[in-house]
């Protein structure tokens, strides 16, 4: 990617745009507009007391619960894993790991195991179904799940044991086709939370932590991206930076598994 393309891609991110200062009057106008949108699209901001109570209860004693889960899950806590998200992300629901082996690549995509904590017969489940998704507005987020849950036990924060669903893929070194696919429940321990800009800096700095891992991830992701284009896939953003390419291609590969 050229320096001009990199600059253009970076300018489109929250990190590249920098902070914006507004007056108190403008802040009030934004709040009023936000409330109008909530009413127009029937978006609920506050959670019912029962949902909040369930969320608090599910975050009690989670470390002991995770230890108990090790008996029934793959223990991947020693596997290097990391998350890459926007600078303003509040929950980290996916992480990746990658390794080059003699006979190809091995890629892991880890997804936070939300369903372990949110069951179909719970008030949290009913509320999540009603909301449908998390709504992101400028400087404001309306969560699908209570932040007590979404930003703690359901978030793959660094240096904490977390429950996950893992897609482990062995890829052919030439065609990048699947040699093996294994999907299982796991316990992981993310090594670091990166922003997209931090990922770019790690790629540029050979001495930075996770440089080798991110470089390998981009090498693989770039090849998968080019392969998709050759296969006729629609590419909406050809100037996407390396960090976004890594996450996008790894998630697409996991979705195909």
Descriptions of predicted regions:
Residues 44-48:
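Acidic, low-complexity central loop/insert segments
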Residues 2-40, 50-257:
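Electropositive polyanion-binding surfaces
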